[in-house]
Amino acid sequence: MGNWGLGIAPWVDGESELEFRRLGMQGPLEALRRREWNTQRASFSFSFLIALSPHTVDYCHSYELFNRRWHGHVLATQRPSLFILMLV
């Protein structure tokens, strides 16, 4: 194990001055601004749309129909449709 941390003064969040310089940042404030910008940008990347194919919907519908019949429930409709889910 090497002595990699010798002579490097860590800042508040544990990052070192050397690490900030490696990333091309002047100090913790600039790093914080960049981190906030990256967080805002990343938050939009988690929103995406999923459209299930009719085959998948039919399989899910058949499974639901089987479960409801197995437990003695009545299914209101037996016609599969295309579901679109929005994940945010």
Swiss-Prot record:
Q: Which GO terms describe its cellular component?
A: cytoplasm
Q: Which organism is it from?
A: Homo sapiens (Human)
Indicate where this protein is primarily found. Answer: cytoplasm
Q: Where in the cell is it found?
A: Cytoplasm
Q: What is the protein's name according to its record?
A: Putative cancer susceptibility gene HEPN1 protein
Q: Which UniProt keywords apply?
A: Cytoplasm
Q: What is the lineage of its organism?
A: Eukaryota, Metazoa, Chordata, Craniata, Vertebrata
Q: In which tissues is it expressed?
A: Expressed in liver. Expression is either down-regulated or lost in hepatocellular carcinomas (HCC).
